[in-house]
Design a protein with these regions (language model features):
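A glycine/serine/threonine-rich, flexible loop-to-helix segment
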Residues: 52, 59-84, 125-126
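Short, small/polar-rich loop/turn modules that mediate ligand/substrate recognition or access, typified
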Residues: 51, 56, 110-112
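A short hydrophobic alpha-helix cap/turn motif
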Residues: 7-8, 50-52, 65, 103
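Alpha-helical segment proximal to the catalytic Tyr-Lys
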Residues: 4, 48-49, 108
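A conserved structural motif in NAD(P)-dependent oxidoreductases
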Residues: 84-95
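Short C-terminal tail/terminal secondary-structure segment
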Residues: 100, 111-126
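Catalytic loop of short-chain dehydrogenase/reductase
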Residues: 13-39, 43-52
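Conserved SDR Rossmann-fold cofactor-binding beta-strand/turn motif
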Residues: 56-66, 103, 116-118
């Protein structure tokens, strides 16, 4: 309802920083997996509407990132990191840098995409 009342100018970006649980639900994060998947579906639909105004909607789905929340969920973060393909957690700054590079290079045609941002950790293809 709120989104229907927002006046949107032409051009720009809307980024959704979701989670890889939208593709690989996590039993420790049942509610998060459900609402993030649902919101990602809504975001995909909105991407088609906003495309008419040259607004790109890009969903970034991070995997293991070095945040306080990750530390709450994982008992031994250092041991867990060693199991990852890159042997480390992602950095929040890397997500910000990625978003900035999209904007700086005016990459618009990526609209509607979900970007897996997980250091090759996921097993899904799409």
């Amino acid at each position: 309802m709120l989104l229907q009342k927002i006046k949107v100018n032409d051009g720009g970006y809307i980024f959704l920083i979701s989670s890889n649980v939208i593709k690989e639900p996590n039993p420790k994060l049942i509610i998060s997996s459900a609402y993030r998947s649902a919101f990602s579906s809504v975001f995909k639909i909105l991407s088609k509407e906003f495309a008419k105004k040259q607004i790109s909607c890009i969903n970034i789905a991070p995997g293991p990132i070095n945040t306080d929340r990750t530390k709450e969920l994982i008992d031994d973060v250092e041991a867990f990191a060693k199991t990852l393909p890159m042997k480390r957690l992602g950095k929040p700054q890397e997500i910000g840098d990625f978003v900035m590079s999209i904007v700086e290079h005016d990459i618009k045609y990526l609209s509607g995409a979900v970007i897996n941002f997980d250091g090759a950790n996921s097993n899904f293809v799409f």
